[in-house]
UniProtKB/Swiss-Prot annotation:
InterPro entries: KRAB, KRAB_dom_sf, Znf_C2H2_sf, Znf_C2H2_type. Belongs to the krueppel C2H2-type zinc-finger protein family. This is Zinc finger protein 667. Gene3D superfamilies: 6.10.140.140, Classic Zinc Finger.
Length: 609
């Protein structure tokens, strides 16, 4: 059983022996890895706290072993090994470390030099390991044998602790909650739960600490007392030399897991907690631990599948298989997924009319506070973004950024060879080409179109359903994609930074300017692969290709009739609703199609002389 060192007197200073706990080899082996780590952290922290206030002058062997990552158990002489304390015959319950109750003076009275090797449990005894006289003096002690398994022990407490495992006896009871434990270390670890909220208050400044030792260190600030000064006590205490290491730039404490070094033990203890927080996935077949990406490769090795040839393919596959687990909160209306429920709640305000932020002047509602702040600038007339080149002032940062693109050098548009989409630079084109090269496991059930991500498929399916979850706050117009809403909002802003050099017409987007310039140049970069017919706009090519394939993705919910374009579906739906949005300004007659209104207006033009 581990023995707690003898308690100090009421007026005596705190020593390392008052805080230390020692184990035999058998007791140490019974501890779990988590208990060993906690024991190591607590012992090192207590020792270095004592060193910082000058209360520990000699460096115990057990501290040297712990800092080197070696087992700190007390060795019994029959095992013929050497531990942190010399021999089991030494009474560990009443004497400080490195002392013998029979031989008198401490064997390790003198501190070991830096070149001396600290003996460990792996080092065997030789003639110079332990004095022969001391060895003979303790050889007469009888060993104790377990009646159940025949194992021998040299301490009655060790035998009692061993027999508890046969009987299942739990002899250590918590005085607070009456919970019973088999080992004293388990009881000590358990009592930290009750003592966690225990506070120690400074009677001078009122600062509160959760440890009594920390309060003692703090009180030295008010007392102005220091045990050792750099100028006076040069070599009087090894604790001072150890304390001086904190002021040097040399890193002396190294993490055994990652190799990182620190100048202070407290920093190392804080760093070691970061390793414990890391969650590592375990594959049940071999009980091996992996991080996210390697576990995918390991699973394929176990089931006989080929691994990915490149890291890029591995990341793409992991993204496809874990997209739902990484974003567990999915919107029930548009299918978009989020990693946090707060982001989902903020997103759902787009679909609902419950906009919590209201303008006091025009009573308009907004879903986000940032949108309301931008809206208030309309009433106040505030314009804070001023262009340094042309003195133009914009009320929004996005409009200011778009305006600055006018003064930048125009980039030559580069077309994608796969789909014909235009880009302003090679960098953007390379990013776009990844769409064509990656795997597309998500397939649409209606038109058989494939996509690389689930979110792309969800956005595409809105074409068939006609769902438009994104609504403009200015005019109420709805869109099926967020990017379409973003582009539409630029119509309401007065800023049109992209101007045609030939006719002076201005546009809010560079893509619209590029399409307009083709009217002057006659360029038609989009060619049909079947009939070789060319078009100036990409959407015109897409609509034309549907005449060859017969694809009609837009279906009417009322009668089931399908159309190749969304505008044809909108015109058809007006036949069910009898809606006639096109009204003549002269006679008030209304039509469901704009072409019918144009033909009607020709009648009024003929009547005029």
């Amino acid at each position: 059983m581990p023995a707690v060192r003898g308690k100090s007197k009421s007026k005596a200073p705190v020593t390392f022996g008052d805080l230390a706990i020692y184990f035999s080899q058998e007791e140490w082996e019974w501890l779990s890895p988590m208990q060993k780590d906690l024991y190591e952290d607590v012992m090192l922290e207590n020792y270095h706290n004592l060193v910082s206030v000058g209360l520990a002058c000699r460096r115990p062997n057990i501290i040297a072993l712990l800092e080197k990552g070696k087992a700190p158990w007390v060795i019994e002489p029959s095992r013929r090994r050497w531990g942190p304390e010399s021999g089991s015959k030494y009474e560990t319950k009443k004497l400080p470390p490195n002392s013998c109750h029979k031989s008198g003076p401490s064997i390790c009275e003198k501190p070991t030099s830096s070149q001396q090797k600290v003996p460990t449990e792996k080092a065997k005894h030789n003639k110079s390991s332990v004095p022969s006289k001391s060895k003979k003096e303790h050889s007469g002690k009888k060993s104790l044998k377990c009646n159940l398994c025949g194992k021998t022990f040299f301490r009655s407490l060790s035998l009692k602790l061993h027999q508890d495992f046969h009987t299942g006896e739990r002899s250590y009871e918590c005085s607070t909650c009456r919970h019973v434990f088999r080992q004293i270390l388990s009881l000590i670890l358990h009592q930290r739960v009750h003592n966690w909220n225990k506070s120690y208050e400074c009677d001078k400044c009122g600062d509160i600490f959760n440890k009594k030792l920390t309060l003692m260190i703090h009180r030295r600030i008010h007392n102005g007392k220091e045990s050792f000064h750099h100028e006076k006590a040069s070599d009087s205490c090894p604790s001072l030399s150890l304390h001086r290491n904190n002021h040097t730039t040399d890193s002396v404490h190294q993490c055994r897991k990652c190799g990182k070094v620190f100048s202070r033990m407290s920093s190392l203890l804080l760093h070691k907690r970061s390793h414990n927080r890391k969650k590592i996935q375990k594959y049940n077949k071999y009980k091996r631990g992996f991080k996210k990406q390697p576990v995918l490769v390991h699973k394929r090795v176990c089931i006989g599948k080929k691994t990915h040839e490149s890291k890029k393919a591995l990341i793409q596959s992991a993204r496809q298989k874990t997209c739902q687990s990484e974003n567990p909160f999915m919107c029930g209306k548009c299918g978009k997924s989020f990693s946090r429920i707060s982001a989902l709640m903020l997103h759902q305000r787009i679909h609902t009319s419950g906009n919590p932020y209201k303008c006091d002047k025009c009573q308009k509602d907004f879903g986000r506070l940032s949108t309301l702040i931008l809206h208030l600038r309309i009433h106040s007339g505030e314009k804070q973004f001023k262009c340094s080149k042309c003195e133009k002032v914009c009320s929004r940062l996005s409009s200011f950024i778009q305006h600055q693109k006018i003064h930048k050098r125009k980039k030559k548009l580069i077309a994608c060879k796969e789909c014909g989409k235009m880009f302003g630079g090679m960098k953007n084109l390379k990013v776009h080409l990844n769409i064509h090269s990656e795997e597309k496991p998500f397939k649409c059930n209606k038109c058989s179109k494939v996509f690389g991500r689930q979110s792309f498929l969800s956005e595409h399916q809105r074409i068939h359903t006609g769902e438009k979850p994104y609504q403009c706050e200015e005019c109420g117009k709805a869109f099926s994609h967020r990017i379409s809403l973003t582009r539409h909002k630029r119509i309401h802003s007065e800023d049109r930074p992209y101007e045609c050099d030939l006719c002076g017409k201005a546009f809010s987007q560079s893509a619209h300017l590029a399409q307009h310039e083709r009217i002057h140049t006659g360029e038609k970069p989009y060619a049909c692969k079947i009939c070789k017919k060319s078009f100036a706009q990409r959407i015109s090519l897409i609509l034309h290709e549907r005449s060859h394939t017969g694809e009609r993705p837009y279906e009417c919910n009322e009668c089931g009739k399908a159309f190749s374009s969304g505008s044809d579906l909108i015109r058809h739906q007006r036949s069910h609703s009898s809606e006639k949005p096109y009204e003549c300004s002269k006679c008030g007659k209304a039509y469901s199609r704009s072409s019918s209104l144009i033909r009607h207006q020709s009648i009024h033009s003929e009547e005029t002389p």
